[in-house]
Amino acid sequence: MKIILVDAVFCFVSDKGQIFKEMHILLETYINKKIILTGANDEQFKTFGLDKIPYEVFTLKHNPEKTDPKYYEMMLEHFNLDKNDVIYFEHNIDAVKSAQSVGINTYFYDDSKKYLGELKKFLDENI
């Protein structure tokens, strides 16, 4: 069963630390494990409310950033996962390209639209 990797800020939570309720409801329809990915440092972790969300959170504290393929290589190694074990959605197009460059099936989520229909389709087709 594939693990769903979720971009933290602007996908699952706002920059004010509010959980995007509709996103949470959508994710809860899947029994798959979810891991929230972020680059947040300790201060940002609290600011964004990442210490209060219902899923495991992975961060490398901006070293490297998610726009660097090394971030995803290190994340996969940390969890002892293969690129084929996961699917991912992310709001930053450069981070999307970075994840794709290491072979992770990744969806660009346009956080300005907050439209979940296409994301649900991606999840349904790739889990």
PLM features: residue spans?
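Substrate-recognition element of Asp-dependent hydrolases with the DxDx(T/V) motif
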Residues: 4-18, 23-49, 59-61
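Acidic, Mg2+-coordinating phosphoryl-transfer loop and its flanking beta/alpha structural elements
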Residues: 87-120
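Short active-site oxyanion
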Residues: 32-35, 83-86, 105
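Substrate-recognition "cap/lid" segment bordering the active-site pocket of phosphatases
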Residues: 42-84
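Short amphipathic alpha-helix with an adjacent loop that forms part of the alpha/beta core around
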Residues: 73-78, 118-127
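Short, structured coil segments at secondary-structure junctions
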Residues: 30, 51-53, 102-104
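Non-catalytic pre-domain segments flanking phosphatase-related domains
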Residues: 1-5, 85, 125-126
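Conserved phosphate-coordination/catalytic loops
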Residues: 17-18, 66-69, 113
